[in-house]
């Protein structure tokens, strides 16, 4: 069965917002999972493995939350894989889940990514002191900005490539009623006029701190 095709059978999302004080972390992820199972016509019994995407644990202040949340995610007695690739964790989670199906190892995989940043403080979580980070005081943006500049230099991409991506993403987000931000009038000029944070990254290229699961 190696090399078999992978497909999305169903999806489920919560409303993304600054604070979801009406649910716990378990309740938040279960809300999205229940919707995905209903959309796919599946039950937990149909799931062979669970892949959970989660960025830094400091965003919620709970280390390895996937372990105590296993019951809520229907992962009891099943393989549970944690994916953490920082800002790309949402896409990486889908890639890992698809690869498990394509390899023939599992038939149905539940992929779920989430954050509940209101439980902690994202600015603190991205600016933690030693021994967790090198004592340079750069923060997440300070580490990523040189990579963006290097990409622009190597590829010949325009210096405003990040702003172009932000406009595309904001316009797509405006079509999703569950999205945190709705900016249907966003333009390249508006993004370029926003505050410079870490050259060449501007404020309107960054994401909000959100509670949500998918």
What kind of region is each of these model predictions?
Residues 91-99:
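Conserved phosphate-binding catalytic cores of ATP/NTP-utilizing and phosphoryl-transfer enzymes
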Residues 98-112:
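Hydrophobic or amphipathic alpha-helical targeting/insertion segments
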Residues 1-82, 103, 113-214:
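Conserved "HGTGT" condensation-loop signature of ketosynthase/thiolase-family condensing enzymes
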Residues 27, 88-92:
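Glycine-rich anion/phosphate-binding loops
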